């Protein structure tokens, strides 16, 4: 996603009144399409313009253009500018960014144009949850490109995070416009992704700070200030939980139910882990592998009691801002609260496997039962979210819900422990595709009984899992954990340029040949890119939304 990391210190430097005065809320632009205006430069010319929704676009076309163009969809961006914190960015994006980059990695763009491949992308007319708007923009942009560059033969769609979801939705709705797709750590359909976000936020509010508003924000800048106030409170919760991991102390802002659990001897780390398991957040993170512990007496207790909670904490910190901004953005878009958990049975969201594997970290069966009991809809201290009927109806009738169907040759890449888009999103797509592929094979065999010739169906999905090392946690001389950034297979959109090149090369090859490469040469390229694995036997849990 595109927004920068939230920095809590930024809020302390600006008064509420001053911040309110400087908030800028972006609205979708609407205008006639313009361009493309091209500079005619060589060896690569640049063309710019806007689609009919006002979205800025950019194209870079080499003089050696051989007919293939990529269309990039960028990740999540906020719709509100807050000076010093984050800004609305509607500039055109052409490819994944490297550290500190915007608009697309120059190295990656050159890598493609040197091959005779053109690149294009949009900034989109609105940010936030913009899947539906982006799909329309991309369809129009492809038409503009083909009209200008009439020798175009292949279009390859790709994107990550929000853009990964956009690319998957585009491939589902407009397979006739593209030849292949590269989908990286995609958001799930809004129904599923929003449940993941809101479950996390509601559970933290319910146990750790019931003064958090979360829903019913005011319109405009005043509501943005309320959301920022909530963000400060969530950040304070994480700070308190980190400080209390060893002692088990709960945040002082905890609800009556939370304080009762504390009085019953349940440490805050057990509640923190419970929130993670109920929402579906990984218990392994960039710093915590859940395997290696500090030397000495804590070595046994560490992986059982402490590491899962600390990993959950680190992952929550990674997804918190996206969750809150996503919830706020959708409230603006739908005109009210479009999430409802009045009928959710959270006890059913705790799997039998989690009850067993994390039993010690949960502080035992009695503690598990006690924590789940406080989440009952009958508990007045845990008020549920009641969605606004009109907002729920608008969401259901206007938001496209991705099916996960694979309609064009598609390569996917995702980290095992991405905190924003869990691996279960791609696992579900992979599982559904295996069912479709099995049905296609059965149909081919049946047809062969009549024709006498068997024509095997081609696999249309190749999943590249970004995997972790066998272990990676580190500790200082005092046994304190050392923070680690960028561990492969963890974090959000944590990919290397070599991996991006492999993914887009795979998609381009699929576009050229009509099917994905499964040769030994392809497997060698996967190995050479490092940290990736093709595995059709993975069993990552689906998002909780599908537990029906």
Per-region residue spans from a language model:
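C-terminal His-loop and adjacent cap/lid subdomain of alpha/beta-hydrolase
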Residues: 32-160, 165-548
């Amino acid at each position: 996603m595109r927004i920068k990391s939230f920095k809590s210190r930024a809020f302390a430097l600006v008064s509420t009144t001053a911040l309110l005065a400087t908030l800028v809320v972006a609205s979708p632009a609407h205008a006639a399409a313009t361009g493309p205006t091209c500079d005619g430069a060589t060896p690569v010319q640049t063309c710019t313009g806007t689609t009919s929704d006002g979205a800025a676009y950019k194209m870079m076309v080499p003089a050696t253009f051989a007919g293939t163009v990529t269309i990039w969809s960028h990740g999540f961006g906020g719709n509100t500018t807050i000076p010093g914190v984050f800004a609305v960015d509607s500039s055109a994006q052409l490819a994944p960014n490297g550290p500190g980059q915007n608009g697309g990695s120059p190295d990656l763009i050159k890598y493609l144009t040197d091959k005779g491949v053109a690149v294009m992308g949009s900034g989109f007319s609105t940010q936030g949850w913009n899947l539906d708007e982006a799909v329309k923009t991309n369809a129009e942009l492809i038409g503009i490109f083909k009209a200008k560059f009439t020798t175009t033969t292949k279009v390859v769609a790709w994107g990550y995070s929000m853009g990964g979801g956009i690319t998957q939705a585009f491939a589902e709705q407009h397979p006739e416009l593209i030849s292949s797709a590269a989908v990286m750590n995609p958001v799930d359909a809004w129904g599923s992704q929003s449940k993941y976000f809101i479950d996390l936020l509601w559970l933290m509010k319910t146990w750790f700070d019931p003064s958090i508003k979360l829903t019913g924000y005011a319109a405009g800048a005043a509501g943005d200030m309320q959301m920022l106030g909530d963000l400060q409170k969530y950040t304070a919760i994480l700070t308190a939980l980190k400080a209390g991991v060893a002692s088990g102390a709960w945040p002082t802002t905890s609800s009556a139910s939370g304080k009762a659990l504390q009085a019953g001897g349940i440490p805050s780390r057990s509640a923190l882990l419970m929130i993670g398991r109920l929402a579906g957040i990984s218990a392994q993170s960039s710093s915590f592998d859940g395997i290696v512990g500090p030397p000495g007496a804590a070595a046994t207790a560490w992986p059982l009691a402490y590491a899962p909670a600390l990993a959950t904490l680190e992952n929550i910190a990674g997804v918190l801002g996206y969750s809150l901004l996503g919830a706020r953005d959708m409230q603006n878009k739908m005109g009210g609260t479009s999430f409802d958990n009045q009928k959710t049975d959270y006890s059913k969201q705790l799997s039998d496997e989690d009850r067993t594997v994390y039993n010690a970290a949960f502080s035992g069966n009695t503690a598990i039962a006690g924590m789940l009991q406080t989440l009952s809809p009958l508990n007045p201290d845990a008020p549920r979210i009641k969605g606004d009927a009109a907002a729920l109806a608008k969401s259901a009738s206007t938001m496209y819900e991705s099916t996960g169907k694979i309609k064009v040759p598609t390569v996917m890449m995702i980290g095992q422990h991405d905190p924003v888009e869990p691996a279960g999103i791609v696992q579900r797509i992979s599982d559904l595709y295996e069912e479709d592929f099995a049905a296609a094979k059965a149909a081919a065999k049946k047809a062969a009984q009549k024709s006498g010739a068997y024509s095997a169906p081609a696999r249309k999905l190749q999943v590249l899992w970004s995997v972790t090392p066998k272990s990676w946690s580190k500790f200082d001389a005092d046994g304190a954990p050392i923070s680690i950034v960028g561990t492969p297979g963890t974090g959000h959109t944590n990919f290397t340029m070599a991996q991006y090149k492999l993914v887009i090369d795979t998609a381009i090859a699929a576009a050229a040949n009509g099917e994905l490469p499964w040769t030994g040469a392809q497997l060698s390229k996967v190995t050479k890119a490092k940290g990736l694995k093709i595995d059709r036997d993975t069993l990552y849990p689906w998002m909780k939304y599908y537990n029906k």
